[in-house]
């Protein structure tokens, strides 16, 4: 099982491909926040960055066994604790 490196949170966008973190907080509001929650982006969910797209504008992430793309500007607002 993975171990948390520290209690400090970083933006999901700061993780490199292959790195994962536990979702702690979302600074998103409105319909986007609800949509991401419906897709599994909830407190305590394991989120892994699978790949970063050209120019870094999109991230492919795995959450609850599903890979999906999210925009960098939204990933900046999702705070995670890095996992080892």
Regions found by a protein language model. Name each.
Residues 1-11:
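Long, charged amphipathic helices and adjacent flexible linkers at domain junctions
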Residues 2, 76-84:
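Glycine- and charge-enriched low-complexity intrinsically disordered segments
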């Amino acid at each position: 099982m993975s171990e948390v490196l520290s209690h400090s949170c970083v933006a999901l966008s700061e993780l490199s491909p292959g790195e994962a973190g536990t979702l702690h907080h979302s600074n998103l509001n409105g319909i986007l926040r609800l949509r991401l929650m419906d897709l599994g982006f909830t407190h305590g969910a394991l989120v892994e960055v699978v790949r970063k797209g050209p120019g870094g504008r999109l991230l492919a992430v795995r959450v609850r066994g599903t890979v999906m793309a999210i925009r960098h500007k939204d990933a900046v607002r999702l705070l995670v604790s890095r996992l080892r």
